[in-house]
Amino acid sequence: DNFNIIYSSGTTGVPKGIVQTHRARSHWATSNAIEMSFNSESKSLTTTALYSNGTWLMMLPTLFVGGTLYVMNGFDAKSFVDLVKREQITHTFLVPPQFSMILSLESLQKDWFSSLKTVLSAGSPLRPDIKENILSAISENLFELYGFSEGFATMLKPHDQRKKFGSVGTPVLGFEIKIIDEKGRECSPNVA
């Protein structure tokens, strides 16, 4: 059965509605819980609107493992920081403009974010300077997700952030990836 439809503006292709099934979302919750260390002690903060995949990215794995979910009613950088510090948030999702707003706060201190075990970014690639500032000033526990509207298929994990700038990462647990050429034929390894 269909679960929801996520609409894409066509950033990387043609605008479309992506139908997601209950089975796909169930797999998504399970694989995300494993890949990003969600557990019953997790305190997850969603910063995006309820129709966003970012919200589902926090909500489903958190509820799947019996964690606690916090939902912001609109994003404000100072309120985000205050909530992370006060509630000792362990998992959060932000889009690149939200990171920029946080990084522009005066007297930003990395210890404000010490409770964060997983910081997720998607929606558009992080610029290298923004990524370096996130890693230095917020958290080194950064995961970047790609193919987000479709449910995402690749992930750049924290240990690869500085080693593989510009990479889209590796396939998410349970996914296989193939590269095709402009004629739709599968490419051999090491060919793009």
Task: Cite the ranges covered by each PLM segment.
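Conserved beta-loop-beta connector loops within the AMP-binding
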Residues: 178-192
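Conserved AMP-binding/adenylation subdomain of ANL enzymes
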Residues: 26-43, 51-91, 105
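Short Gly/Pro-enriched turn/cap motifs at secondary-structure boundaries
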Residues: 166-172, 186
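Conserved pre-ATP/AMP-binding loop-to-beta segment of ANL
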Residues: 1-7, 14, 37-43, 151
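Short beta-strand->loop structural element characteristic of the AMP-binding/adenylate-forming
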Residues: 16-19, 46, 68-74, 143
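Short, well-ordered beta-strand segments
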Residues: 3, 43-45, 51, 120
